[in-house]
Swiss-Prot record:
This is Taste receptor type 2 member 5. It comes from Homo sapiens. One of its GO terms (molecular function) is bitter taste receptor activity. Expressed in subsets of taste receptor cells of the tongue and palate epithelium and exclusively in gustducin-positive cells. It holds the Pfam family TAS2R. GO terms for cellular component: membrane; plasma membrane. The chain crosses the membrane at residues 2-22, 46-66, 83-103, 128-148, 176-196, 224-244, 254-274. Receptor that may play a role in the perception of bitterness and is gustducin-linked. May play a role in sensing the chemical composition of the gastrointestinal content. The activity of this receptor may stimulate alpha gustducin, mediate PLC-beta-2 activation and lead to the gating of TRPM5. The lineage of its organism: Eukaryota, Metazoa, Chordata, Craniata, Vertebrata.
């Protein structure tokens, strides 16, 4: 018999799953639609497609974990599911980092020669460097997940409490998030500085005029700021989700922490859609056509 609190958490988890499914699915459809319309992949479309695809997978992994954990608490497959979960989560962070670098390249308005050189050369170089780092981290994560899953046993001279070892396990699996998070923060900081300098120029030269570039700055910063907040909640809830599964497992705690984690892939997709007029209009058309088709084919 489920308690009322656990039933409410399950309802919230399902709602978050449906929001993420619709939001990220709409972004994936929009990206493919743009490709079919133009027969050319732009950097922005590729980033949005990768980001939405990772979030789509992340939503499924969270709901699978919540569904399977009560039934298969000691199964080896849950170990593999957790490793894949970490990889998809880190890939999502990488694509968000690519998005922040893309915004920084397209929107910032510094006039210094060093920055102009960096803007022209370092964008592609940073993407290749981040991609290489991601591949290395993928291999390390798989190795850690497969060989460092059980705490020391027997007569080992070094012994960890099970909960402490689980925190160490979470720390090692998430170690690949640090570099992309630093790049993300640097890019976002450059956007903030660029907005500040641009705002000072506009106050002097064109008071009262409509400032399109400032609006682009603010839209990008809203998206990146919401992502950072949701990602920090996700990162802070992750270790508690792991330790709540230790013996004896606390199912209510698992649902609390993973429901908080599920807000990251579901809500940020809506923020992306609402912040980009083209995507918002396209997604509205897609959803309207889906509803109309459902009414036509429904009973």
């Amino acid at each position: 018999m489920l308690s009322a609190g656990l039933g409410l958490l399950m309802l919230v988890a399902v709602v978050e799953f449906l929001i993420g499914l619709i939001g990220n699915g709409s972004l994936v459809v929009w990206s493919f639609r743009e490709w079919i319309r133009k027969f050319n992949w732009s950097s922005y479309n590729l980033i949005i497609l990768g980001l939405a695809g990772c979030r789509f997978l992340l939503q499924w992994l969270i709901i699978l974990d919540l569904s399977l954990f009560p039934l298969f608490q000691s199964s080896r497959w849950l170990r593999y599911l957790s490793i894949f979960w970490v990889l998809v989560s880190q890939a999502s962070l990488w694509f968000a980092t690519f998005l922040s670098v893309f915004y920084c390249k397209k929107i910032t308005t510094f006039d210094r020669p060093a920055y102009l050189w960096l803007k022209q050369r370092a964008y592609n170089l940073s993407l290749w460097c981040l991609l290489g780092y991601f591949i290395i981290n993928l291999l390390l994560t798989v190795q850690i997940g497969l060989t460092f899953y059980h705490p020391p046993q027997g007569n080992s001279s070094i012994r960890y409490p099970f909960e402490s070892w689980q925190y160490l396990y979470a720390f090692q699996l998430n170690s690949g998030s640090y570099l992309p998070l630093v790049v993300f923060l640097v890019s976002s900081g450059m956007l903030i500085v660029s907005l500040y300098t641009h705002h000072k120029k506009m106050k002097v030269h064109s008071a009262g005029r409509r400032d399109v570039r400032a609006k682009a700055h603010i839209t990008a910063l809203k998206s990146l700021g919401c992502f950072l907040l949701l990602h920090l909640v996700y990162i802070m809830a992750s270790p508690f989700s792991i330790t709540s599964k230790t013996y004896p497992p606390d199912l209510t705690s698992v649902f609390i922490w993973e429901t908080l984690m599920a807000a990251y892939p579901s809500l940020h997709s809506l923020i992306l859609i609402m912040g980009i007029p083209r995507v918002k209009q396209t997604c509205q058309k897609i959803l309207w056509k889906t509803v109309c088709a459902r009414r036509c084919w429904g009973p």
